[in-house]
Amino acid sequence: MITRRRQIAGLAIVLLAAAGPALAAETQVAVAANFTEPAKEIAAAFKTATGHTATLSFGSSGQFYAQMAHGAPYEVFLSADADRPKKAEQDGLGVAGSRFTYAIGRLVLYSKTPGLVDNAGAVLGKASFNKVAIADPAAAPYGAAALQTMQKLGVYNAVKPKIVTGGSIAQTYQFVDTGAAELGFVALSQVINVSGGSRWVVPAADHAVIDQQAILLYPGKDNPAAKAFLAFLKGPQATAIIKKYGYEVK
């Protein structure tokens, strides 16, 4: 059910569209790598609806935060967690009151090999693989969730020598896709449209909630395109795209 906040956002989008292309502007958006494909779709729909252009950059949430702290001119931040947007707000990098959850992420243990990954993750306790890929837990929330999952399953110490670490969840998926690792913990959004292979959607209770938050950054506080993009992200069209990629929406 669409919340009142999202209904209000939908109305704002209609008003922005009515303003026409004369008000068209551009905004720089830092996007957590797990959200690459939905962000591309949302940006295209946003341009059609408002005339504004959202220029997207993709990477790990931790890397983006470090760049922003050193003056990178991003105007909107779509993080893979809630901690960094909260920190941005506390440190004066983000506009107070603009932070909200845009998606709840899901973690998947994935392999290109059919039958390798079972429906309970028991493969992690077996000797049937040489490498498992995870994103850097210090920089990528999906990596932290992977670490928590292995610890909860009691397999982390045995699996640790087999771990290969990606700088972002995008690189982690590449490790699996190219065969550098037989299996890896990736975002559901990365494999939801991939046929074949084998996968286990990790129960949400096995790790901390992947609460993905967005925030308006100070370089964008007076940019109508930045504000419009966040309003659009809350609206029904973006919500439908987000759900299509396997995310949950509050």
Place the predicted regions along the sequence by residue.
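Bacterial N-terminal signal peptides that target proteins for export
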Residues: M1-L11
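Short, intrinsically disordered low-complexity segments
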Residues: T3-R5, A19, D83
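Bacterial N-terminal signal peptides
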Residues: A9-G20
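Exported/periplasmic ABC-transporter solute-binding proteins
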Residues: A24-F58, G62-A72, S79-A82, K86-G92, ...
